[in-house]
Structure formats: C-alpha cells, structure tokens
Amino acid sequence: MNNSVYGVAFRSLSTGDEKLYKEATRFYHSLGFQTVKLYDNFKNHDDSNLIVGTSKNSVKECWLESFKLSELDSQGFRVPQQEASNQLQTDGVMIKLRLVDTEPLNQTADTVVYYTVSLDEVSKIGERVDDHNVKLVDPLGNVVLVTDSHDGKELNASEFIAPKDSSVEQKITVELVDKDSKKKKIAVMTSGGDSQGMNAAVRAVVRSSIYYGCDVYAVYEGYEGLVKGGDYLRKMEWKDVRGWLSEGGTLIGTARSKEFRERWGRKQACSNLIDQGIDALVVIGGDGSLTGADLFRSEWPSLVEELVKDGKFTEDEVALYQNLTIVGMVGSIDNDMSGTDSTIGAYSALERICEMVDYIDATAKSHSRAFVVEVMGRHCGWLGLMSGIATAADYIFIPERAAPHGKWQDELKRVCQRHREKGRRNNTVIVAEGALDDQLNPITAEQVKDVLVELGLDTKITTLGHVQRGGTAVAHDRWLATLQGVDAVKAILNMTPETPSPLIGILENKVIRMPLVESVKLTKQVAAAIEAKDFDKAISLRDTEFIELYSNFMSTTVNDDGSQLLPEADRLNIAIVHVGAPSAALNAATRAATLYCLAHGHRPYAITNGFSGLIQTGQVKELSWIDVEDWHNLGGSEIGTNRSVAAEDMGTIAYHFQKNKFDGVIILGGFEGFKSLKQLRDGRDQYPIFNIPMCLIPATVSNNVPGTEYSLGSDTCLNALVKYTDAIKQSASSTRRRVFVVEVQGGHSGYVASFTGLVTGAVSVYTPENAINLKTIQEDLALLKESFKHEQGETRNGKLVIRNEMASDVYTTELLADIITEQSNDRFGVRTAIPGHVQQGGVPSSKDRVIASRFAVKCVKFIEQWNKKNTAADNEDFKILRFNYVNGVKQYTVLDEDLSAAVICVNGSKISFKPIAHIWENETNIELRKGQEIHWEEYNEIGDILSGRSMLRRKIQKEQQEESSLPSVADTPLSSVTVSTSAAKEDSALYV
C-alpha cells in the first residue's frame, strides 16, 4: 500500500548505476536542494572531515539540503541562522544520495511529501494533481509529492517555519570512533607457474594497501611459505617494491606445496596468519592456486576452532579472525581462466613467441624451410591460436579444437602445399603442448614434422619452452597487473564475511570482479569437456573473442581453398585506404582484410598513398594473396599513407569510386581518417556513390580517435616507450639521485603520457588535460625533494617525469628540466629525453597484430551486411545509388543508411560500430582533435597513489595544516590541482 509520509527530515537513497546517481542529483537540485557535501571513496577515504556520516559501502555520496526559507544576503547566499534578522529557522530537509557497488534494496513505496511556497515553479517539472499538489517521480523511481497546503489550507512562508527557541542550543558532536582499533593486515602471494607482470601486481597491492592505511605482508615461496610461516611472511614497506615494474618473474618466489593440499597444512597456514594478525589474502596464480585459496577460505572458521581446541589460541585471541577474506588475480601465461579476456603474463608470453617466430621466419625463407613451433598451453590453446594469427602460421593445433583422427595429416599437407603454390617460401605450424586429435591421442611436434617431411619440405622443430615465461612484462601486462592489484585491495576493504570471494578480471578495457568459484569451475569444465571428447562445448566455454578469432583464422588461412566463395551476385569490390601518420599494424589489418575478402570471393583494392594519391593519380591496386602474405609483422604502411583528407577533392574521389565500382571502403587511420569518414558521409547528398558502407579502423599511436578507447598502433607505441623508459630509468638509478624528464607524443590527448606514467612508475605526468602552472611545478619540486631526502643512495631510485608534447606552450620539456635543476640546489641532477618517432615502433606488437586481424574481419563483415540490406531491384545503377525514384519521389533502398558510415569502437567491455555522425556531434572535440571523454583519467589517479605522490602530498598538507591550523583539503592528484578546482565547479554545474 502506498502511503503519504509528511515531515521527513532525512532520507537516504541508493543506486548502483552512476548515470542514475547523477540524474537524481540534478533532479533534486531542480527542486531547490543544494549540495552541502560530496564524497568519493576513492579520493576521500582518509579525509576525516568528509568521511563522517558516510556509509561503508558507498562509492560516492552527495548530501543535499533544502534552505528555501532562509534569509539571503545581497549576493543571494544563505545567511547563517545565528546572523539572520528574522530569527526564524526552517525545519530542514536533508537527502543523502549514495552510489553503491552492489545492487541496492528496493526503495520505499511510500510517497514523501515536501512543502513549498513556490508551487508554480515546481509544477513546470511535475504533474499537477490539484491546485495545491504536484506529483513527481525521481530517476530512482521514488514518488515525491510537493504541496503548499496542510489539511486543505494554503500556508505561507511564516507558517512553514517556527520562531527560534533561544533556550535550546542545538549542538551536534561527531566523534570518530575506530570500531576496530587494529589495522587491516593484508598478505599477498604468488603461486603456481610464474608469469611476467606478477611483480607489477605485487607492487600495486603493497603500495595501495599502504596508501589505504593497511599493513601488508608478502608470502614468500607461495603456499609453501604460507605453511612454513616465520621469515616467509615478511612485512613490506613502500621502498621494498621499488623498481619491480620492470622485473620479470616473481621476486617473492613461487612453489607448489604438497603440505597445503592436506588439512593439517592448511591449519598450520591459518595459525601462521593469525600469529601475524592477517585476515585477508590476495592470491596471484592459476586455477589450481585459486581453488586452493577458496578452499582455505571455506575451511577457515573450522580451522580457527580446531586451533582454539588445540590450545594454540584462546577465544579472545581469535575473536577478530573469524573469517578470511580472499581475492584472486589470475597470473598465467596460458590465459586459461574463464570469464576474463586476458590474464597477467599472457600477452608478454605471446610477445616472446612472436619475437622468436619472426626470427625463425628470416632463416626459414632463406632456406625455403618449414618450421614446427611448440608453444605452451596444456589445456588451453590461447597462445597457440593468437600466435598463429600474429605470425601468419599456415596451421595450428590446439586442444579445444581437436584435429580429426587420421585425417589431419592430409589436411595439413593440402594447406601447406597450397600456400607454397601461391608463392610462399616458408611454412610455419604452431603446436600447443596439449594438442590432440578427436580420439584424445596427443599430437606432437615430431609427428607434425614427419608429415611435412613426407611433403618434401626441409622441416625443423623449435620448442620455445620457458623462453615464453622470460623477460620483462609488456605494457599491457604492467597496466593489467597494476589496475587489478589496486582493485583487489579495494575489493578487500569493501567485502563482508558474506561476500563471495571475487576474482579480478578484464573484459576488453574494463576491470571487472567475478565470482572466483564459478570462474574456476567453468575453467575446469574445459578440460572435462576435452576429456569427454565434447570439443564443441570446450571451445564454447572460451570467451567470444577466442571463438571469433578461431573462426577468422580458419577463414583466412586453412579454408582459403575456394570452399567459402560466395555467389557471384554477393561478391564485392572493397577499397582499403591508409590516412594520417603511419602506425604499427596498418599492414597487419590490411593483410587480414585482404585474405578474408579473397577467401569469400571479394576483390580487395588498395588506394595507394592515401586520398591525395587517388586524387592526383587515380592509382588503385587490386591486392593478391602473395602481395600481403608477409605483411603481418611489417611496420609502417606498405600501400602508402599521408595526412591528406577526402575533402581535398570530393568530386575526383567520387569519380574513382564510381569507376572502380566500390561496394565499400575501409579507412585505417587517426583523426585525419576520422575526419575523412565524416566528409565522405556528408558528401552523400552530392555524390550518391558515397552511399556505400564505409568504416574506420582507428589506427594512431596517440589513441585520440573520438568514440573509442583503443587504436591500432597504440600498444606498439607503449611497448616502445616502456623499453625506452626502462633504459632511461636504469641510467637514472645507476647515476643515483637523477631525474629524467621524458617527452612523449600524443598531440592534445594525454593518453600515451598517462599510460606510460602508470606502467613506468613516473613521479609526475603532465598532460594537456591538466594544465601546467607554477603552482603544480612548485609542488612537484617539493615532492622530488621530499622523495630524495629519504633515500640513502640505494639502487632503483631514479625518477621519471613524463610530459606530453602539447602539455604546455610555455613550459617546454627543456624549461621544465631547467626549472627543476635550478630549484634542486644540487640535491639531484636532471636530464631530458625525447624518444620522438621511435614511439611509432618498428615491428607491430602481438596485441596490435591480433586486434588488427579481428577489427579488419569485422569491418569486411560490416560491409557485407550493409550490402545485403540493399533492397534495390536487380539494376546495377539502383544497386550503386542505393535509391531510386518512384513516381518522381526519391526512395532509399537501404534503411537507416546513416548507420552505414561508422567507426569500430572499444568502450569498456563492448566492441561496436558507432555512426560517425553521432560521434562527431556528441563525442568529438574538433578543435583539439580528440574525444570529449577522458577515459584514462583513472590512470593518473592510480599512478599518483603508486608513485607515492599522493602520500607525500598528504603528508605535506598535514604539516601545513598543523602549522597554520587550517582544515585539510581533499586529497587530489598533484598535477591536476588547478584543473581539479575548475573540474569541481564544472561537475557541480552538471547538477545545479
């Protein structure tokens, strides 16, 4: 039953949707409520002034209060009640809006009634019920009734308020009570096989734990150390993980433990943790390690009970340790965990494989040889599949898609022979160590070699082995491990005993939390399905990206024998053009699109030297299989590119499109490509040939294409910068007390600078989004001095400052270095480093190659689908024009034609085609050549926490506060102090 509730002085409303949270804030502002407090758990968790009254599971809170009947001064500001001339006070209405990380309980069904003396104003945004009442529904679904009467009688302002009672002094005393006086203690461990990026994960857990006010311990030697205890459980300090970002393997060790598999071993581990006061554990490992961790958690209460019975502890001593909090992170080069796109170390291992196979290709071509390359992957073929795509292998053997018993030999021969006949000089076959046929017989590298020898090929075997685990982590794995490590600590602090153990994963570009038990269970089902010979189920349990890429590989490589040719009427002419500055993976994407087109009967055309080449020469080249066969690992652009855009001569471009009868266009490029797509789309009214489907694959090192969070070439750029800055940092550390100011590219987009700063542990990052001024430089100087003051000439103490090339017209890289040098008073030295066009990279990274292949095939399918939507009669002119005239009226033969000019975009966990018209109007900053959304701002915040800048600033602020007795300010990132102020005003403006 819905009741009307009067006189509500305080109300708390919750939502798990950030969009609804903002809409609700705007709604109550429109009713006259004013924001009196904003709280963000990520930024303000340790601010004693802001944390008072906030709820434990709030991600954000906005406190709103109504002061509609208060006296205002000449500026329109509310006069404090004690200073008001009328000595009247309002009843006061407070609303607390909360953004929570779990789905909130249903809100009350009751209608809350508020009084107003401005009912006419309220009626403009609500529904008039009668002369005295207006009904509204807030974005969270709560019904609000606003009235100017009581019992049918209209009230005036004086009747809403009461005389101030001077004999009663309202006093609110808020005390901060630490309900649990002990510090939260978190342990972190690595277990199972090592993988690149584990050290970055440990570093993130250690430093974010310290930042959030926790004690943190490292468990050395995995579960073995957990059982042994003592020196194997070591408290970690900030400096202990300095320099770990660039280290391979795991510096805290890993080992498989037979003892932990026994209950007595787990009981001993429980005892060791309680001895140290630890009740939270971050486990970085594979499915076996994570299964053991969850079993440990489920047994924990009974283990504690047994320890009390054994007399090891008293009831009082274990009172605070009744539950163990477990958070899992997947560290595995196999990438075999269900529910997550990639695991820590997988892309680094893939990069090693690609490097080795690229080297092998050179000698194989020289001698016209075949190579069989064995890669890791006992129950998972991710490395086998991705390396097959990235290295242009002729054939792959993976466990999820077993080869047909007794038949795979002939198919392998046919594929390799066909590719030789097309002009290929070498053959590469990738064999996962867990490869088998559909009768569960293992397929070994030796067996594959014997088949190729029968074909008459000089064949060699290369088993890569533990090379795949070696080396430092690539940029992707450092980024993944860092973000997941911080999120693991935040998960621990937000968890209750009832919360299921989470597993930190990633979907496309978004870090997610999944139920650990369910993820491990799904992972083990893959091996069970293979054992049961249910290979369709096995591959279906992999993520959609895996299935999609496997299908693409088969289409472009194994089944390029004419079996997939479409009917003549469905075969298309598809143009491919590169626009803008060169970036890695342009050739890899062109290769994948070409091979997919050829396998289906389409004719791919390369527009050479960009749109200016088409305008000036009209040169178009039809691409063949042998033209693109070895483009998978070539940087730059084989068909030529420049910064010319379509608008230079639309008429000539339309002529050549019509002349070559193009049915679709794939543009690869950065902002120039983006602009060209918009120009072609806008030219449709004048040039009907542009009605063909057109799509853009974002490809630029700057990653500044609006609408998407990923561009081809940006990963290669970041890997180049990681190698460069690692070398620079080593030099800075060797010299002791040295700072390098490194200038990176990116135009007006700070993505490259922010990402580089995060994965290299930079002290400061200057980006165009956060303006540089003297104040920020002074604060950075104070931080550098403070940082070096505590260092006693240890190793790994070199510092990096990352500056985007467009961060400031005044404060250039050289000027920044000069200012820091001048103010350092010889406490430390400063040098500059500008990598320049080295950032474009040479050989494209494995990640860029794989994503290039995926995007390219998606774009060809996009063009196919839009051509199928053409309902024109079998008339060539109508088919090309995509419209005809019926009784003098122009009628389009393709519905929603505007959607056929689109950009392939990655947003969070989603890949989609976004119409260029929508992105241009809603998501583009045309003047600054980038998107409006700064999706990488979190990198700066996390980077500041892990580099120590946030903690040092907090310390300096505290000292200043003690000296001046001023209240502390919110903890905001240093390099965005001035912008944070304006950003706060801007944020408020959204709600007011």
Swiss-Prot record:
Principal location listed in the UniProt entry: cytoplasm
Region (N-terminal catalytic PFK domain 1): 1-558
C-terminal regulatory PFK domain 2, as annotated region: 573-992
Residues binding beta-D-fructose 2,6-bisphosphate 1: 643, 700-704, 745-747, 805, 837-840, 929
Keywords noted in UniProt: Allosteric enzyme, ATP-binding, Cytoplasm, Glycolysis, Kinase, Magnesium, Metal-binding, Nucleotide-binding, Transferase
Binding-site positions, Mg(2+): 287
Recorded catalytic activity of this chain's protein: beta-D-fructose 6-phosphate + ATP = beta-D-fructose 1,6-bisphosphate + ADP + H(+)
Active site: 334
Listed InterPro entries: 6-Pfructokinase_euk, ATP_PFK, Pfk_N, PFK_vert-type, Phosphofructokinase_CS, Phosphofructokinase_dom, PKF_sf
CDD domains, per database record: Eukaryotic_PFK
Record-level GO BP terms: canonical glycolysis; fructose 1,6-bisphosphate metabolic process; fructose 6-phosphate metabolic process
Cofactor names: Mg(2+)
Binding-site list for beta-D-fructose 6-phosphate 1: 332-334, 376-378, 433, 466-469
Sites where the protein binds beta-D-fructose 2,6-bisphosphate 2: 738, 831
PROSITE patterns xref list: PHOSPHOFRUCTOKINASE (PS00433)
UniProt binding sites for beta-D-fructose 6-phosphate 2: 369, 460
Cellular component, GO annotation: 6-phosphofructokinase complex; mitochondrion
Organism domain of life: Eukaryota
Disulfide bonds: none
Location within or outside the cell: Cytoplasm
Pathway assignment: Carbohydrate degradation; glycolysis; D-glyceraldehyde 3-phosphate and glycerone phosphate from D-glucose: step 3/4
EC number(s) given by UniProt: 2.7.1.11
Family listed: Belongs to the phosphofructokinase type A (PFKA) family. ATP-dependent PFK group I subfamily. Eukaryotic two domain clade 'E' sub-subfamily.
Function per UniProt: Catalyzes the phosphorylation of D-fructose 6-phosphate to fructose 1,6-bisphosphate by ATP, the first committing step of glycolysis.
Quaternary structure (record): Heterooctamer of 4 alpha and 4 beta chains.
The protein's name: ATP-dependent 6-phosphofructokinase subunit alpha
Provenance organism: Kluyveromyces lactis (strain ATCC 8585 / CBS 2359 / DSM 70799 / NBRC 1267 / NRRL Y-1140 / WM37)
Gene giving rise to this polypeptide: PFK1
